Every structure is written in structure tokens, then in C-alpha cells.
Amino acid sequence: MSLKDQLIHNVHKEEHSHAHNKISVVGVGAVGMACAISILMKDLADELALVDVVEDKLKGEMLDLQHGSLFLRTPKIVSGKDYSVTAHSKLVIVTAGARQQEGESRLNLVQRNVNIFKVIIPNVVKYSPDCKLLIVSNPVDILTYVAWKISGFPKHRVIGSGCNLDSARFRHLMGERLGIHPLSCHGWIVGEHGDSSVPVWSGVNVAGVSLKALHPDMGTDADKEHWKEVHKQVVDSAYEVIKLKGYTSWAIGLSVADLAETIMKNLRRVHPISTVVKGMHGIKEDVFLSVPCVLGSSGITDVVKMILKPEEEDKLRKSADTLWGIQKELQF
């Protein structure tokens, strides 16, 4: 009789049923691992699967997380280069791809990452045909479109992390200026995640008090307080962090875990995330841009109709045109 048999009397033989709240992360670079640890710390999954092509790094990251099991509430952490480890996922987060170099625009990464997605997406779909796909790899808006096209999924199940982080950065910087926690500073950044994102100044408020009503020059060149600089800092922030530490990881990891929580718990919170915007704000092409979306366990169920100023709509359409110009040239 083994020690285990002496210690434990078995009452019921469990059939090996699969996890009920499984999350998979594709890519165990800095961003993928920041997503993984943020998700583990929020107790969102009963199983976490990691996938990558670099096997030693992958196994090392898995073991390192498993060694912290005592301090976590996620009983199963697995990894493999084969996508069978991701089977039956509720949510699959894709962070894999070529990394943005210092000074490189997100759009420059495109074709390099499309080729990577041609391998990843069909494998994800094969093992988790009912999952939600959350795309994080840059340029996120275009790659979300690519994932949608390759997967054949309905659009509500293919989500780009989009401006969830840009808006968080904006609210942080707004909070720094006002001496108020970002949770109480409300403001939305929409459009492209990156250089042509659009700050919606008309909606910026604290406790329902419109800052633009108090300070009409806000966000314009005439503004003596230079609030436009806050949006410029948001746009520059990734470049600054990349210049200083080589990559960004923690904020995007936390931002992705925030989205994962909304999905896994069916919270129906509104997030600025990337979805198909055809037919909205005068956009005629199949492009993905961030707009305020109601998010839950089936993915994106609704979009909040923002009231934008004509110049804000123009910027959004310009973003759409830029993205479409690139998308229509893609080979996949």
C-alpha cells in the first residue's frame, strides 16, 4: 500500500473532465508573462495554459509560476509548444509576434506579424472553437482584423486590447495633474491604439463635472494649461518606456487582466477596445478601431454610440483610412 493510499481514502473516481474557466496565453515574452501573472493574481481561471515556440523559455516560465502555486488559486498551470494544451479555453490571449524596436512604429510590424498569425490562429481555433480571442500583439487593430479573417469567428468573439491601456494612461496622467485617483478621473481615448488615437475631450469629467465646460480651451492649441500635452504623453508613453527599459509589459499585462476579468465574470463593463467599426461614424471599410464596447462572457455584445465633435469624427475616419490602406495590401 502506497503512502498516498494509507493517507487518503478515495470516495469518488473522477472522470478527467476539462477545466471550466480556462485561459490560454500565446507568447511568453515580457507582455505574455505580465498578462499571465496579472490573471493569476486576480484568480480568474481554474487552468492557465502557455504556448510559445521557444521551448526552454516556455518550460522555465511554467515551472517558475508553478513554484508559486501555494500563493495562487489556479490549480493547474500547463505549457507546450503544441496547441493541444490550449484545448477547451474560454479565452485565448495572443501576445506573440515580432517585438517593436526602438523608434519603430506599430504599423511597421504588420507583415512580420501577419505571417506569425497564419500559424497561431488556425491552431487556436482547432482546439478552442468556441473561445473568445483577445489580440494584444501590435499593431493591434490590424492584427485583430487579421485574426478575425483567419479564424472565421463571428466579430463579437474577436477582440483587440485596443485603447483600454491608452485610456488608462490618460486617466493616470489626468489624475496626476488633479491629485485624484485615476478611477475617479473619467476620459476616453478611442480610435487607433497608437499614434493616431483620438482623445474625446468633451467627455472628460470628474464626478460628472465636465472639465471642458469649466475650461473651454481644453485640448486645443489655445489652452494655457496645455492639456493637449496629456494626450501627447499617452501617445509617446510606449516609446518612452521602450527607450528606457527595452519593452513595455506591466501596464499592458494589467490592462489585459482587466479585460479578462470582464469576460470571465460576465461583468458587462464598458471598455475602449477594438472591434469592427464599419457603419459607425461614417466609416465604410472593415476596419477595427477602439470604441466603447459592452464586454461580457460572449464577447462584445454592444457598442455605446459616442457623441463626437466633427473634428473628432474626422480624426477617427483618418485612422480608418490609414489602417485600410495597410490592410488591403496584406498577404494572408
Curated annotation (Swiss-Prot):
Residues that, per the record, bind NAD(+): 29-57, 99, 138
The entry's keywords: Cytoplasm, NAD, Oxidoreductase
GO BP annotations, alphabetical order: lactate metabolic process
Domain of life: Eukaryota
Pathway membership, UniProt: Fermentation; pyruvate fermentation to lactate; (S)-lactate from pyruvate: step 1/1
UniProt similarity note: Belongs to the LDH/MDH superfamily. LDH family.
Protein name: L-lactate dehydrogenase A chain
Organism this protein belongs to: Columba livia
